[in-house]
């Protein structure tokens, strides 16, 4: 299954708020939400919706998500927490959480177009796994800095998670530590995703 490129607001109406997918919000009084919420929810449907939330928020394919669940299952700690830590430590998500891009697909595009450096080296793989003490910067040219400058100016510094710090003057971000569960930017029950 390929990455979703269709209408984003339809997914938000169906699954709820997905801040990584888009900044847009649906109009209130939507008939679509009422249509899908009527009646009793089945257990399978609840699990499927939680999995789809995770997939669409982080912009993953089905195969990528299964691979992350498999890696998290091998860990000795809680599978759900390890899964969220793996997804939150992806380079495209770190750039989004630092405020260098307005959405995760926008952050993925910055990485693919080689505007981002990790520890002084160009990285063009959005799924690159960041580690504590990694320094994320932009290229030293005006075009790269201009792309990031607009996003940083419009982002809210109060929403920056505790495991990240950013220097808005030099457009430099630092990963301080591994993420805690309470700082995940998405309301989700990760155990239902693992059970699915």
Curated annotation (Swiss-Prot):
Its main location: plastid. InterPro entries: Ribosomal_uS4, Ribosomal_uS4_bac-type, Ribosomal_uS4_CS, Ribosomal_uS4_N, S4_RNA-bd, S4_RNA-bd_sf. Residues 89-169 form the S4 RNA-binding domain. GO terms for biological process: ribosomal small subunit biogenesis; translation. The keyword Ribosomal protein applies. One of its GO terms (cellular component) is small ribosomal subunit. It holds the Pfam family Ribosomal_S4. SUPFAM superfamilies: Alpha-L RNA-binding motif (SSF55174). GO terms for molecular function: rRNA binding; structural constituent of ribosome. It is found in: Plastid, Chloroplast. It comes from the Eukaryota. Signal peptide: none annotated. SMART domains: Ribosomal_S4, S4. Keywords: Chloroplast, Plastid, Ribonucleoprotein, Ribosomal protein, RNA-binding, rRNA-binding. Part of the 30S ribosomal subunit. Contacts protein S5. The interaction surface between S4 and S5 is involved in control of translational fidelity. Belongs to the universal ribosomal protein uS4 family. One of the primary rRNA binding proteins, it binds directly to 16S rRNA where it nucleates assembly of the body of the 30S subunit. With S5 and S12 plays an important role in translational accuracy. This is Small ribosomal subunit protein uS4c. The gene is rps4.
């Amino acid at each position: 299954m390929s990455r979703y490129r269709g209408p984003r607001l339809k997914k938000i109406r169906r699954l709820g708020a997905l801040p990584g997918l888009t900044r847009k919000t649906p109009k209130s009084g939507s008939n679509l939400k009422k249509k899908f919420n009527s009646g009793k929810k089945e257990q399978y449907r609840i699990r499927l919706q939680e999995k789809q939330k995770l997939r669409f928020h982080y912009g993953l394919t089905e195969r990528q998500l299964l691979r992350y669940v498999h890696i998290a299952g091998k860990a000795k700690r809680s599978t759900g927490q390890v899964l969220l830590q793996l997804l939150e430590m992806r380079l495209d998500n770190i750039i989004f959480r630092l405020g260098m891009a307005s959405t995760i697909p926008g952050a993925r595009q910055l990485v693919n177009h080689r505007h981002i450096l990790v520890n002084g080296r160009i990285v063009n793989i959005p799924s690159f796994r960041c580690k504590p003490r990694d320094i994320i910067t932009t290229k030293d040219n005006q075009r790269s800095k201009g792309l990031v400058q607009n996003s940083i100016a419009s982002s809210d510094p109060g929403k920056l998670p505790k495991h990240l710090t950013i220097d808005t003057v030099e457009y430099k971000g630092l990963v301080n530590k591994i993420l805690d569960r309470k700082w995940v930017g998405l309301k989700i029950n990760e155990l239902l995703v693992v059970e699915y």
